[in-house]
A protein has these predicted regions:
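Glycosyltransferase-associated regions of secretory-pathway enzymes
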Residues: 1-74, 90-266
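Small-residue hinge/turn detector
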Residues: 75-87
Length: 266
């Protein structure tokens, strides 16, 4: 008999290095403890992730680590660690405002409203951050889920061929390519094995929007506070030009530098 695939009541987050955690992390941590009392909370770090193995194995991970691009180191780590585990990954700036158990048990109105499209048990959930992109501030997965395997394979080869590097764009690309996600941006894929929640569930306000209490809806379970540090010049020079070669790479880097300093002067 095959092992039953379930999403465990475990919360995972990534933290690299010995730097002091920001205040937003502790606010979110308290929300996890308060609203998810039955969930185990696990930190993914250098002690429980085989850094040496992956630094040797994956060039992109190694270069990000050497350049201290911790956001992208974290992206890679979350995918690989969660592939071997079952539970819910959350960013350190993802506040949880309601118990997620009804989602895991598929006992919310969303599933009832989509019942004509569902014939299988949910094995992976994630959410849209806007009308176009899937975001990765929170996702739930069963162990050895094929979606995360596809993402891992992207990091092995396609990462050097495609002009994308942020994990929302990587997930969106893989969903479009492998799971036939159309421009309609479906919520149910593979007869219910994959669920992509509308933005109101976890991203009630967008990256370029200002938070107001009015954005919280009855179906909102989390608030992503968008506490990122993605845009250093060092990061841009590496990430935006990684897929190019020769003169194209040189020209791209010149444009990146010019754009960066023009922005700084404004």
């Amino acid at each position: 008999m095959s092992e039953k695939k379930i999403i465990d009541k475990k919360i995972y987050y990534v933290w690299i290095g010995n730097a002091k955690k920001p205040e937003i992390f502790y606010k979110c941590l308290e929300s996890w403890k308060k609203n998810l009392p039955d969930f185990e909370i696990i930190e993914i770090n250098e002690k429980n992730f085989d850094m040496e193995k992956h630094l040797k194995k994956n060039r992109f991970f190694c270069e990000c680590y050497e350049k201290k691009l911790w956001a992208y180191v974290s992206d890679y780590m979350r995918v690989h660690f969660m592939y071997e585990n079952s539970g819910i990954y959350v960013d350190t700036d993802m506040e949880i405002i309601k118990d997620l158990t009804p989602i895991l048990e598929e006992k919310i109105s969303f599933f009832q409203n989509q019942k004509d499209k569902i014939s299988k048990k949910m094995e992976f959930f994630i959410g849209y951050e806007d009308k176009k992109h899937i975001s990765v501030g929170i996702f739930g997965t069963t162990k050895y889920n094929e979606i995360l395997k596809e993402i891992m394979e992207f990091y092995e080869a396609d990462i050097w061929e495609k002009p994308i590097w942020t994990i929302p764009k990587i997930f969106t690309y893989v969903f479009e390519k492998k799971y036939n996600l159309s421009e309609k941006r479906e919520n149910i894929l593979k007869d219910g094995e994959i669920v992509i929640f509308p933005k109101e569930y976890f991203y009630p306000y967008g990256y370029h929007e200002k938070y107001t209490k009015d954005c919280i809806k009855p179906e909102t379970y989390g608030i992503h506070w968008w506490n990122d540090s993605w845009s250093s010049l060092k990061a841009r020079l590496f990430l935006e030009a990684k897929h190019l070669k020769g003169i194209s790479k040189i020209v791209k880097k010149i444009r990146i530098i010019a754009r960066y300093y023009l922005k700084e002067k404004r």
